[in-house]
Amino acid sequence: LAEAVFFWGKVMDANQAQSAGQFPESLDRKANFPPGTIELASAKMCTAQQPQAVITNYLNLLQKVLNGDTGIIHENEIGPVEGIDTLQSIGAQSHLSSLGKQALGSLAVIRLNGGLGSSMGMPTAKSLLPVRGTLTFNDLMIRQLECLRKETGHNVPLIHMTSFRTDEDINLVMQQAAYCNPEDLPVTFRQHQHLKIYLDDLSPAQESRDDLNWNPPGHGDIYAALLATGIAQKLIDAGKRWLFVANSDNLGATVAPEILGYMIHYRCPFLMETCRRTEADKKGGHLAKNKSNDRLILREVAQAPTIEGEVIPEFGNIGRYHQFNTNSIWLDLQSVVKIAALHDGCIPLPLIRNIKPVDTEDPSSRKVIQIETAMGAAIESFPGARALEVPRGRFMPVKHNSDLLLVRSDWFRENADGTISQHESTGGAPPPTISLDPRFFSMFGDFSSRVLHPPSLVHAKSLKVIGNWQFKEPVIIRGHVVLETQNQERGQTPDLVTQELVDKANRN
């Protein structure tokens, strides 16, 4: 605590100056943050046993908030990205795949497993959601790694980064699966936690329920967590140099030797897998080029300027900003250690300022600022970092139950190696657009009771479900289908979807 307070003495001087009615020029005069904000936040972080490097980094981000920094990346600061390589182009270079296969023994896989399935009505870790029959995301990840080891003879470890919300669940499940990593490497490590800040007076959150005072710091914490927990050093000691990091709910994120070979061949310290944006992606973050240093930069929607509460139209210009981050990245662990050593044990990352109710289950509760960072934003911290455009097959996230319906259907097939791929019967067509009535399908429990038998979607272009329906028997969706019923009450028995009704609802 003493070290943190001493390091941030200048900021505390600013608090003292404010109490005396004097504002330094560097601080926003409208902030009106209470005296002692930095000391109180530092003390709370220390009490929560957060590492010194994490506290220092958090206080740095907090100072930006107190100074009025919103983390916004303005249009005149960035430009479009051109001329990035594609997986298709490097896949034709057989020497890259061979190089990657030879280096698999020095690779480790890390899955981001800190999120709950709350958006789908699940109180547990999202990776415990059944996605194919009884198989969960976790089951599929384990199967993939075990098949990779058997096929290649290389002991590639699988390590989960958990959060204070998911750590117990994930460790229990991995123990039940009797999963162990080679070289006695740990199966999990836990990311840190950030203190919430009240929006109205910029003081640290002090709710009676202590868990409401904290938020996960965003997946940008992976760098600090790797270093502070000692995982980075353990991996290095075990001969691991390369990391493949991906979201636990991305079924398309698998080890690709040709990408690893590409990194090694070009001595790339950081590689981000990107996909080409479509109209459906225009509300999400995008890749750009920083005009000040010509480096790649990531702009998330929370960092986009707004006009009268609406994000500027340039943000959604998919012609200008045509690449988005899949959140699958490849890292040179030696470069991570080297760059972090230059910045007090952390990789410098831009501020993401998320405003939410202090109790997310009570929208009327007091608003707070959640101080977060994004893993992909580190692309601008690594000289020589690259982006690689990959096909949509490597980006198959399950964010909503509409995604889950598609994954459970025959549009996908489950392969022997634990991977999920588009079924050949689809002819390579883009996935159908699926819209499920949120009143009856948004929560996993409701979805499970209403989708007892997923419909066939191989020949579907779109499916829209309005009202209280139940899929209980096999039906085939062809073309564009809209199912609408007058049954709009949750307490009523759902209407049964039959093939006859589906054929009548066809809008081709």
Regions flagged by a language model, labelled:
Residues 105-131:
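Glycine-rich N-terminal loop/short-helix segment of MobA-like nucleotidyltransferase
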Residues 172-333, 337-343:
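Conserved core of the sugar-phosphate nucleotidyltransferase
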Residues 1-105, 129, 261-508:
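Left-handed beta-helix
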Residues 109-112, 157-164, 188-192, 243-246:
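Extended hydrophobic secondary-structure segments that form protein cores and membrane-embedded regions
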Residues 113-114, 248, 333, 401:
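Residues immediately flanking
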Residues 126-139, 146, 150, 160, ...:
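Metallocofactor- and cofactor-centric catalytic cores in central/energy metabolism, strongly enriched
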Residues 109-113, 137-147, 222-234, 375:
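Structured alpha-helical segments in the cores of large, soluble enzyme domains
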Residues 157-166, 248-251, 392-396:
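Conserved short loop/turn motifs at secondary-structure junctions
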